[in-house]
Amino acid sequence: MYEKEIEELQKIIDDSSRIVFFGGAGVSTESGIPDFRSADGLYHQEYKYSPEQIISHSFFLRYPEAFYEFYKDKMMYLDAKPNPAHLKLAELETAGRLLAVVTQNIDGLHQQAGSKKVYELHGSIHRNYCMKCGKFYDADFIKNSDGVPHCECGGIVKPDVVLYEEGLDQNVTQRAVMAISMADTLIIGGTSLVVYPAAGFVDYFHGKHLVVINKSETGKNVNAELTINAPIGKIMKGIRV
């Protein structure tokens, strides 16, 4: 299955030396982490508040208990393991073929797979800081805390993830844009490209090959040299580095 698509992608990868991968939630669903927008994703489940409300800056400040109840249960998957897509991208970087991974995910699975140059547009569950004194806490501290995690100084610990109503980290975005603009091949995977401003990043690509691998269609399919509607792990698994 997908032999023809894998073969076409292989030709493009063999012709590339500066690949950048731009990925979203679909990259991690094969590791057992639900996405937000698919039919069985978080937006289609019933909650007292919508996910957009809960994971917003103002909601976090007003209702930290409700925020953390949702966040720990629905956004922290500490047992998840990298899948073939994460592993193959790390291999491509080690082989000197991949410049960077630009991800909308917050799970840290790319780094767990061995990727070094990862630009996390929406932050990471693995970085958490006290809002009062700035002390760092890891994901285990958050997950194992009772209710709202507090620092030893008494301040509330906040995850370093970009909530609704918050801006992206300018340092990260600049590096991501630079990598995309330097790429000879851009592989877009596991994202429907509906989250802005992150989705607008791909407009900075002016290289040779644009590839889209996603289970459903995306807004960028039109310009793609190769479009594969399939789970990304199954495709990347068949690639030779």
Task: List where the protein language model places each region.
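Conserved catalytic core of sirtuin-type NAD+-dependent deacylases
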Residues: 1-241
